[in-house]
């Protein structure tokens, strides 16, 4: 039976924010009594020396083969999942495309073709985006696009249940920092972060995310945790002295918001998306010296409250669906 709302996403083998968004959106819609179904489309990945190939490109191919659709709404939760039935699309960011326009990066012919096709296809469908920052990126290309800005709720189920939390960090008098992201992801500036903290005797950096062999023994005070389960991830966020996120750009930045939901102080680099969604609750840095000074600052108040303001996201998605043109 065809559902009223079809959510189509790529079932990637590793953690990513789009996967979390898709699953949480589905659960939220069902809790509101909506006739929704989640279609998990397998993503094909090949790894060579820890680096990922194909990935999202394989999603685009499979989207044309498996034409999932709903009676009223077919919502592709990322632009690689769009097909001929799609009438709602979530665009998480267009950073890569805008860097290419400014000559700051190169795009393969396949990626250029993807963006060209995408902008032709989405000119007359409902677009959902998590921030005004991304809305501006889209309007630069499509000034008259039908856009709803809906910041994703970040409230992991484990934080809402009785959980026997255990502190994963040793009581050794050091500052225990944690960060998240894939080491080979060019957008995440984890390698720079490694340089900031390496060999510091009073600081330990714990890194959650995919790792390559060359970085496993980078410094004695950097602990590569690799991929971890949800409980392990949240335990590290919850008990850390600081959560660190250093990135070129984001559509929303879910890991940082997860840390703030855990009432953990975050330190982030000063970019527009952080200012828009996180307000003045983080500590912002611009260089290594400023970053190191911030490690010893006290925790601010209002961290959880800053993130909980986005908890009405399901209501806003339903409103956006009701605005879709027949």
Regions found by a protein language model. Give the residues of each.
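Carbohydrate transferase catalytic cores enriched for Leloir-type hexosyltransferases
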Residues: 1-326
């Amino acid at each position: 039976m065809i559902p009223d709302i079809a959510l189509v996403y790529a079932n990637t083998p590793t953690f990513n924010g789009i996967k979390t968004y898709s699953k949480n959106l589905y659960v939220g819609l069902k809790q509101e009594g909506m006739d929704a179904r989640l279609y998990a489309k397998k993503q094909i990945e090949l790894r060579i020396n820890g680096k990922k190939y194909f990935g999202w490109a394989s999603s685009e191919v499979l989207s044309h083969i498996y034409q999932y659709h709903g009676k009223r709404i077919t919502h592709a939760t990322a632009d690689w999942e769009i097909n001929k039935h799609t009438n709602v699309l979530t665009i998480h960011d267009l950073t890569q495309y805008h860097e290419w326009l400014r000559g700051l990066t190169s795009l393969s012919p396949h990626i250029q073709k993807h963006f060209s096709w995408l902008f032709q296809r989405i000119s007359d469908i409902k677009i959902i985006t998590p921030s005004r920052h991304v809305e501006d990126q889209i309007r630069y290309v499509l000034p008259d696009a039908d856009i709803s800005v809906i910041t994703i709720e970040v409230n992991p189920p484990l934080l809402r249940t009785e959980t026997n939390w255990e502190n994963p960090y040793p009581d050794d008098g050091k500052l225990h920092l944690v960060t998240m992201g894939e080491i080979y992801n060019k957008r995440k500036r984890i390698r720079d972060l490694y340089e900031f903290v390496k060999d510091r005797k009073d600081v330990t950096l714990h890194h959650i995310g995919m790792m390559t062999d060359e970085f496993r023994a980078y410094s004695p005070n950097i602990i590569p945790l690799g991929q971890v389960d949800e409980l392990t991830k949240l335990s590290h966020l919850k008990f850390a002295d600081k959560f660190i996120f250093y990135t070129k750009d984001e559509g929303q930045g879910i890991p940082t918001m997860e840390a703030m939901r855990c009432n953990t102080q975050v330190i982030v680099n000063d970019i527009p998306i952080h200012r828009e969604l996180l307000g003045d609750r983080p500590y912002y840095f611009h260089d290594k010296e400023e970053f190191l000074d911030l490690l010893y600052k006290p925790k601010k108040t209002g961290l959880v409250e800053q993130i909980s303001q986005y908890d009405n996201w399901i209501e806003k998605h339903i409103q956006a669906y009701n605005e879709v043109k027949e």
